[in-house]
A protein has these predicted regions:
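Acidic-glycine-rich active-site phosphate/pyrophosphate-binding loop
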Residues: 119-133, 172-182, 226-231, 285-299
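Short, well-ordered amphipathic alpha-helical segments that serve as non-catalytic structural scaffolds
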Residues: 52, 85-100, 200, 249-265, ...
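Conserved beta-ketoacyl condensing-enzyme motif
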Residues: 48-133, 144, 269-285
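Condensing-enzyme catalytic core mediating Claisen C-C bond formation in acyl metabolism
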Residues: 1-82, 168, 177, 181-252, ...
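A short glycine/serine-rich beta->alpha loop
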Residues: 75-81, 112, 139-142, 188-190, ...
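Secondary-structure boundary elements
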Residues: 98-104, 160-168, 205-212
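Claisen-condensing/thiolase-fold acyl-transfer catalytic domains that form or cleave C-C bonds
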Residues: 3-4, 90, 116, 129, ...
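Conserved beta-strand elements of the Class I
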Residues: 9-11, 108-111, 168-170, 273, ...
């Protein structure tokens, strides 16, 4: 049996950014107008520095207007998370299925991940209802993987496809980072509010040897470093916590997981022409680039997505892969999807274009 017959394939995928677009100058103005009464002069100066950084031009948010975010009550925030996590993931799934020439009736499995909100029953049940998926579909809702969550999701979806005797499995990642917006003089919050946005993505997996061959994957966990990047609970709400040491920690985990996934197929970094690297911020991207030895020209898609969308947490790597496909991936060329985040963790998936 050939490798193509053994491996699952990504038939298609699609992205769905949130509808409200704000450039960084507008976002900075909103922060100053809404929170200056609780911020120190040092924090206000830092806001200007980080919001005017040239690496990010604009971001997308799941809101109707910025007024939504001011003094948003927890119940209203969770309702917004629920509404938009379902809406954006549904859009991505519908687009991805259409691109593969499939319908909702073809879907036999669904895996959904998020880290920016918790609802029970999970997002998958809302999608069954909204999209008209089979009531006997196999579904899994994953939480807690942070920005790296798309790849563990893919691993579960791949196992679901192989273990279920084929069919069509959908892998959906959605984050409403604005549903965790908080602001005070904590540098973690200031940095987060300049970096994160909202969006969703979905991939369609099947066994046909068409699309992107799912060749190998790997993950690395450093649990003793979990406090360097995580959500913490305060008064029943999520607060993002980021360490300034992250670039020097993430790069090591990222390099290790890339080495693992390449070694499994006797490949080296120079064999990989396409890199879908998570947009964790310019310093982290640079640190990962230097530690792994990725040529800067191979990061143009990551830089572009960072500029136009910021960091949307888990679905972001799909936006980068979408940009790579638009740039062009030739048959038999290798691509590595690389994501990292809470855990501290790093995840990689090796693809080959069919």
């Amino acid at each position: 049996m050939s490798i193509q017959e053994k491996n699952a394939h990504i038939a298609s995928f699609a992205v769905a950014p949130a509808p409200y677009i704000a450039d960084q100058a507008t976002a900075e103005e909103f922060m100053r107008k809404s929170y200056s009464n609780r911020l120190t002069s040092r924090s206000l100066s830092l806001i200007h520095t980080v919001f005017s950084h040239p690496s990010i031009k604009k971001r997308h948010f799941a809101i109707d207007s910025t007024d939504t975010l001011v003094n948003e009550e927890p119940d209203a925030r969770m309702a917004r998370f629920t509404q938009w996590s379902v809406e954006l993931s549904a859009r991505a799934i519908q687009k991805a299925l259409a691109r593969a020439g499939l319908s909702v009736g073809d879907v036999t499995g669904l895996v959904v991940n998020t880290c920016t909100g918790y609802i029970c029953p999970g997002i998958s049940t809302y999608l069954i209802e909204k999209l008209g998926l089979s009531r006997s579909i196999r579904t899994y809702d994953l939480v807690g993987s942070g920005c790296g969550g798309a790849i563990p999701n893919l691993q579960v979806a791949e196992a679901l496809l192989k273990g279920g005797g084929g069919g069509v499995v959908v892998s959906a990642s959605v984050e409403i980072c604005s549903a965790t917006l908080q602001m005070d003089n904590d540098i973690s919050l200031i940095l987060s509010n300049a970096l994160f946005g909202d969006g969703a993505a979905a991939a369609v997996l099947w066994e046909k040897p068409e699309g992107l061959e799912m060749v190998a994957s790997a993950g690395r966990y450093v649990p003793e470093q979990r406090d360097t990047i995580r959500y913490i609970h305060k008064n029943g709400q999520l607060y993002n916590q980021l360490s300034l040491k992250l670039p020097q920690l993430v790069n090591k985990a990222a390099a290790a997981v890339v080495a693992d996934v390449l070694k499994s197929h006797s490949l080296v970094v120079k064999d990989i022409k396409h890199w879908a690297v998570h947009t964790g911020g310019e310093k982290i991207i640079n640190a990962v680039r230097d530690e792994i030895g990725i040529p800067e020209e191979r990061l143009s898609a990551t830089r572009k997505v960072l500029s136009e969308y910021g960091n949307m947490s888990s679905p972001t790597v799909w936006f980068v892969l979408d940009e790579l496909l638009q740039q062009g991936i030739a048959p038999n060329e290798w691509c590595v999807m690389l994501a990292f985040g809470a855990g501290l963790s790093a995840h990689a998936f090796l693809f080959r274009k069919i």
